[in-house]
Swiss-Prot record:
The chain crosses the membrane at residues 33-53, 77-98, 113-133, 178-198, 226-246, 288-308, 320-340, 347-367. PROSITE patterns: CYTB_CTER, CYTB_NTER. Heme b b566 binds at H97, H196. Belongs to the cytochrome b family. Gene3D superfamilies: Cytochrome Bc1 Complex, Chain C. This is Cytochrome b. It is found in: Mitochondrion inner membrane. Disulfide bonds: none annotated. The cytochrome bc1 complex contains 11 subunits: 3 respiratory subunits (MT-CYB, CYC1 and UQCRFS1), 2 core proteins (UQCRC1 and UQCRC2) and 6 low-molecular weight proteins (UQCRH/QCR6, UQCRB/QCR7, UQCRQ/QCR8, UQCR10/QCR9, UQCR11/QCR10 and a cleavage product of UQCRFS1). This cytochrome bc1 complex then forms a dimer. InterPro entries: Cyt_b/b6_C, Cyt_b/b6_C_sf, Cyt_b/b6_N, Cytb/b6-like_sf, Cytochrome_b, Cytochrome_b_C_euk/bac, Cytochrome_b_N_euk/bac, Di-haem_cyt_TM. One of its GO terms (molecular function) is metal ion binding. A ubiquinone binds at H201.
Amino acid sequence: MTNIRKTHPLIKIVNHSFIDLPTPSNISAWWNFGSLLGLCLIIQILTGLFLAMHYTSDTMTAFSSVTHICRDVNYGWLIRYIHANGASMFFICLYLHVGRGLYYGSYTYFETWNIGVILLFTIMATAFMGYVLPWGQMSFWGATVITNLLSAIPYIGTNLVEWIWGGFSVDKATLTRFFAFHFILPFIIAALVMVHLLFLHETGSNNPSGLVSDSDKVPFHPYFTIKDILGALLLTLTLMLLVLFSPDLLGDPDNYTPANPLNTPPHIKPEWYFLFAYAILQSIPNKLGGVLALVFSILILMLFPILHMSKQRGMMFRPLSQCLFWILAADLFTLTWIGGQPVEHPFIVIGQTASILYFTIILIILPLASMLENKLLKW
């Protein structure tokens, strides 16, 4: 009798994805982040579901309902902080996952990569809407500032913003629809993840050398299941240390003040994981130009397959590109720092320099370095 694992219509899908999946034997810990992102998504959906049971999406009671969750619901404080800090862990894993893809040339799998970029956009939209829900000062003003950016779109901008708001300012209608979208989007993300995996398993995983590894593959289970479990334990440990010892470390104190449309906070800024994009937005004096730069700073990821000039896939044997990659990483850290600073000298100049460097490295310097490395191969 054949094994049910290999014959049952449903179980065999799981088998081909997580058990008998042929996997390159040399993939490093950088390949752990895919499974960690899956774990983060599950944590966020579960904690979010329990929070939604007690949350009310009304401007009068939203802030109080979050307070009620933290004070009166059994382990409500724990669920709330796991959800808030889980988002931070999600983005840490996300950025490392994307960085791994850039470093090792995983973007040559077009479909997998492009679905991944769409996933990144969707997750960013979900996180932004989730940040609005507690209805604190930074929630309200963050929502006002970011949605207002759409007014930069010529001709239809103002109408579009009022349509999204459901009125003439961020109010009850906005909060209700943001809650609805924040609830539904994680399930759309889960569906997109399935498509992401579907395309990945069409080609098989990349590996650190960037070479074809068909002759040297091992089954996913037990080798990589145990490796993923180790990663999951480390992620859970980090998350719980954050939640139980300093749950507000990555948050904004302004969000413990109920939203007040009559009082603007001195420095409006988003959560830390959006600061790099916010810095790029701020560094351009023109509103429409800033919005375009903001969108393009993420959309530029879709250009990587076109900009790939090297005859080698990854950067493992390309020291010049490696150097540029780490300069780009340092530049993103600089942008993140600048995004959290007030808009004044010298931060404006640093932000503008870092923004120009970001686009220049990706669009001009990296492709040129790749072409130079191709020439050096002939020596």
